[in-house]
């Protein structure tokens, strides 16, 4: 007799989109690639004391509303222009809530805020949001907590 003993509590499996497919679906333009690269380069120069501006990384704890995030980014862009000689403003764009043990886990994991866990949708929303923020000319910083965030552009060391 054969007994089913594996995966007894799994209701369904949903395959994650590959990084390649997400990048093909939401490609990065040369203009946005230049903004990302130059943001990373500027950050590196400030950290290496080659630029005396202060770095400000500001934004919400975790993004839950992409439209509100873009409105916030537009306001930061105005401040970035006003204080460009004194400050480098980077928008904090976190998609997960790693220290939350109960409740909503973040935009990537549950983009509809309803417990449906449409992770593929969340990945696309995240990448698209970072793209649009960079397209405004504003650098974006995120926290990499999970391999699911591998498809999102963000400022980091331009040499890597």
Where are these regions (language model features)?
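Metallocofactor- and cofactor-centric catalytic cores in central/energy metabolism, strongly enriched
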Residues: 63, 69
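A generic, well-ordered mixed alpha/beta core segment in the N-terminal half of proteins
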Residues: 76-146
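Polybasic, low-complexity association/targeting segments
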Residues: 1-13
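N- or domain-start disorder-to-order transition segments that initiate the globular core
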Residues: 13-47
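Conserved small/polar residues in nucleotide/adenosyl-binding loops
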Residues: 150-155
């Amino acid at each position: 007799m054969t007994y089913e003993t594996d995966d007894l509590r799994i209701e369904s499996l949903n395959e994650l989109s590959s990084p390649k497919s997400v990048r093909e679906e939401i490609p990065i333009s040369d203009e946005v690639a230049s903004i990302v690269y130059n943001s990373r380069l500027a950050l590196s120069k400030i950290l290496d004391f080659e630029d005396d501006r202060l770095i400000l990384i500001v934004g919400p704890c975790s993004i839950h509303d992409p439209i509100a995030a873009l409105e916030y980014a537009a306001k930061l862009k105005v401040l970035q222009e006003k204080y460009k000689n004194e400050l480098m403003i980077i928008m904090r764009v976190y998609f997960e809530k790693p220290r939350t043990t109960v409740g909503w886990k973040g935009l990537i994991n549950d983009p509809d805020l309803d417990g449906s866990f449409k992770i593929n949708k969340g990945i696309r929303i995240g990448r698209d949001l970072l793209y649009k923020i960079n397209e405004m000319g504003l650098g974006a910083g995120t926290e990499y907590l999970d391999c699911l965030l591998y498809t999102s552009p963000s400022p980091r060391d331009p040499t890597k």
